[in-house]
Amino acid sequence: MRSCVRTASSVLQSWRAHTVLRNGCPLPSRTLERLPRLARSYAMAYKPQGELEKRIAEIPIERYRNFCIVAHVDHGKSTLSDRLLELTGTIQPGGNKQILDRLDVERERGITVKAQTCSMIYNYQGDDYLLHLVDTPGHVDFRAEVSRSYASCGGALLLVDASQGVQAQTVANFYLAFSQGLTLVPVLNKVDLPHADPPRVLEQMHDTFELDPEAAVLVSAKTGLNVASLLPAVVEKIPAPVGDLSKPLRMLLVDSWYDVYKGVILLVRVFDGQVRPGDTIRSFATGLKYIVGEVGIMYPDQTPQTVLKAGQVGYIHFNPGMKKSQEAKVGDTYTTLGSEKLVEPYPGFEEPKSMVFVAAYPTDQDNHEHLEDSIEQITLNDRSVTLQKESSDALGAGWRLGFLGTLHCSVFEDRLRQEHGANIIITPPSVPFKVIWRDGTESIITNPNEFPDQDQAHFRVQEVHEPYVQATITLPDEYLGEVIKLCESNRGEQKELTFFTATQVILKYDIPLSHLVDDFFGKLKGATKGYASLDYEDAGFHKSSIVKLNLLVNGAPVDAVSRVLHTSQVDKVGRAWVEKFKVHVERQMFEVIIQAAAGRRIVARATIKPFRKDVLAKLHASDLSRRRKLLEKQKEGRKKLRAVGSVVIEQEAFQKFLAK
């Protein structure tokens, strides 16, 4: 009974503190001392409203605008974001460039990897408007980031480079935004370049997307030319979000990241109701409940507020913090405790599928634990990476990592090296294969070592299917022949060829994913002198003739470098493997034979000759029988050594062999 009374009293006192904070008045110190620890921490953390918060509080939902910038990679999204932040006074002019590119790898490569958000206040015709901007990635590997960003937006700036024109990912991003009902504002960037051709690009946009050329805004994000005319276009053309403050809280989780002090921080879009520090909310996906510790907006960094209201996008973290990132399921719906039956949860987002797999091993097994911690920290902020432990006889304990594409994999590797100082060995990328067994069951195999050898496959496997993608390539017509030849040599199947202007072509090919990850984009850029662009989407699994290629050293397979590939590639890859591996293996006291084998068929072979001891040095030249006897004895000794001796291959040899 006493414990029940104590609990009820604690809840009542917490409610009192919460109520006083709602009324905007700080509590007296004597009252603070009588509160329980948790309620006291909320009350002491109270700060009076600042100037920014007062301005936001006076803006009705009808004057909110949530929008994103979408474009092909390197068309100037992040630079344009900087100009908009400067125009609204959110950041100082001429300060930190690419302010929404927060990762070192983003600044180094000049690309956006994670969608970043920022709120701005813009005064238009005497009224304040709350603008919420999302800077999205342009590369196809991060399409899931773009798709999630659209859920928090009512419109988008469709940005096109005035010199390059409509590119493959411009097309893909347009249809993705159009399918989600976003209002699109066409924007031409880099109009100040000498080779910019706005009339041609406007014609492309009209022919490809049926967008009105008169509605386009022509700007130069680098110099700031005409950028000021973009904000009125956002206010006038992009609709305000729909929401009801009087309804129970309905909040969508758009993204999350990990903070070592606060735990998991959630980026949320509030559709109905409002949320404040001290509220208890529940997740529909997990059923877990949390006490809100802090709410705020990104301005451009985390800026605490006393409330997040319907129509706003902001961040939230809990007290005590959410320590397991697995609890934060992107696409989840949250509501206040007790309102679960009054709120309809959102359907959530489709989980992105890993399309490329690599194995990762530490260069020194003593660093295994440190590397494991580093990988886990990065995967907390990038939920699209899949992780599974594995081990290799040659390279020791490691992990099988799944990525959305080769750039995603490369960025992850760079972050490991730059942010955590990790030294790692990464195997060449592989793709998942679907195996249909003779008993009718199916398996998706992502690890080449688990793929059945040709001898087993003959008895156990009925069919093997490999993943295909539909590649959309935009290019000038003068390179059409070279690109068709490249696609055909990579087992591509032509689906569509369209001239969307007199000199620009859109090609659509179904291409095996295994060829796409094998530097197809680099070859495409080489064939077109950098003028082609590429976008792709999943095209399902197609039946194919697939075998496993093993590298053998003195008859023993080296598991770390097994590969699954099409039969047409076996001879070429096998010969290249043997020649490359031979260079990195040191000579032994016995003969070392390196072979590439597909099942029992030896595709290629190389021999490393042993060190030779001169057993005839002390013999007289005429002693032929003794000479023959010593040579025979040496030959027998080598056979015995080869039978019982194991080839010592240094870790560095694997590192050099697996290097690109």
Curated annotation (Swiss-Prot):
It catalyses: GTP + H2O = GDP + phosphate + H(+). The keyword Amino-acid biosynthesis does not apply. GO terms for molecular function: GTP binding; GTPase activity; mitochondrial ribosome binding. Its main location: mitochondrion. Transmembrane segments: none annotated. Pfam families: EFG_C (PF00679), GTP_EFTU (PF00009), GTP_EFTU_D2 (PF03144), LepA_C (PF06421). InterPro entries: EF-4, EFG_III/V, EFG_V-like, EFTu-like_2, G_TR_CS, LepA_C_sf, LepA_CTD, LepA_IV. It is found in: Mitochondrion inner membrane. It is a peripheral membrane protein. One of its GO terms (biological process) is positive regulation of translation. Residues 62-242 form the tr-type G domain. Keywords: GTP-binding, Hydrolase, Membrane, Mitochondrion, Mitochondrion inner membrane, Nucleotide-binding, Protein biosynthesis, Transit peptide. The keyword rRNA-binding does not apply. It is an enzyme of class 3 (hydrolase). Its EC number is 3.6.5.-. It comes from the Eukaryota. GTP binds at residues 71-78, 135-139, 189-192. GO terms for cellular component: mitochondrial inner membrane; mitochondrial matrix; mitochondrion. Residues 1-42 form a transit peptide. Belongs to the TRAFAC class translation factor GTPase superfamily. Classic translation factor GTPase family. LepA subfamily. Promotes mitochondrial protein synthesis. May act as a fidelity factor of the translation reaction, by catalyzing a one-codon backward translocation of tRNAs on improperly translocated ribosomes. Binds to mitochondrial ribosomes in a GTP-dependent manner. PANTHER family: TRANSLATION FACTOR GUF1, MITOCHONDRIAL, TRANSLATION FACTOR GUF1-RELATED. This is Translation factor GUF1, mitochondrial. It comes from Phaeosphaeria nodorum (strain SN15 / ATCC MYA-4574 / FGSC 10173) (Glume blotch fungus).
